């Protein structure tokens, strides 16, 4: 049996019907979601890593022994991806780096008139967190587009979270971008951990 899509004639729809068509399920549940996210953030603040392991078990149905991805797994990721993917990542890396390098204007001093100077000081954010969603396809381009500017800016610590299990393509992009702090955590709990810190993050 074939599924036939409903044809909607917008001009013939009532205001209420249009509103219903345009509404998203997530928006209709926004208060419920907001309260759940607040609870998750509160638990991550209070219980740290324990909350992360618990939420990974509940939401991702995975019982992790370690939320941190080992350096060995990151380094060996190239063994588990195709030559075509490696080539595509290398080309994308060079292009993205070339573009963002032009944005790095740096600090400067400017004499605007006698005894009056203006200065621009550029300082990188010391520690940053990147979140890479997990879906039907690995979003390794997101790793490149977030990590390359952070590296160019001179951020000293770059952490990355992605829901478990993290795909080898993502780990390979982490390797190329020299990201060493990679964690198997997804959702609001990952954002809370990056923002508030835990024993591991």
From Swiss-Prot:
Binds 1 zinc ion per subunit. InterPro entries: Ald_DH/histidinol_DH, Hstdl_DH. GO terms for cellular component: cytosol. Its cofactor is Zn(2+). It catalyses: L-histidinol + 2 NAD(+) + H2O = L-histidine + 2 NADH + 3 H(+). Its EC number is 1.1.1.23. Pfam families: Histidinol_dh. Belongs to the histidinol dehydrogenase family. PANTHER family: HISTIDINE BIOSYNTHESIS TRIFUNCTIONAL PROTEIN (PTHR21256:SF2), HISTIDINOL DEHYDROGENASE HDH (PTHR21256). This is Histidinol dehydrogenase. It comes from Buchnera aphidicola subsp. Schlechtendalia chinensis. The gene is hisD.
């Amino acid at each position: 049996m074939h599924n036939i899509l409903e044809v909607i004639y917008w001009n013939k729809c009532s205001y209420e019907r249009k509103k219903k068509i345009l509404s998203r399920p997530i928006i209709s549940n926004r208060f419920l979601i907001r309260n759940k996210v607040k609870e998750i953030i509160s638990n991550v603040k209070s219980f740290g890593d324990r909350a992360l392991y618990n939420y990974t078990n509940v939401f991702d149905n995975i019982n992790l022994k370690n939320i941190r991805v080992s350096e060995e797994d990151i380094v060996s990721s190239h063994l588990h991806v195709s030559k075509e993917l490696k080539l595509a990542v290398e080309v994308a890396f060079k292009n993205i780096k070339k573009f963002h390098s032009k944005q790095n204007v740096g600090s400067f001093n400017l004499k605007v008139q006698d005894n009056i100077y203006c200065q621009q000081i550029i300082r990188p954010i010391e520690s940053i967190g990147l979140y890479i969603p997990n879906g039907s396809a690995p979003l390794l381009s997101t790793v490149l587009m977030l990590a390359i500017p952070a590296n160019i800016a001179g951020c000293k610590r770059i952490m990355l979270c992605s829901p478990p299990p993290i795909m080898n393509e993502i780990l390979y992009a982490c390797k190329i971008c020299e990201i060493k702090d990679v964690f198997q955590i997804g959702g609001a709990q990952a954002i809370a951990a990056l923002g508030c810190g835990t024993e591991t993050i």
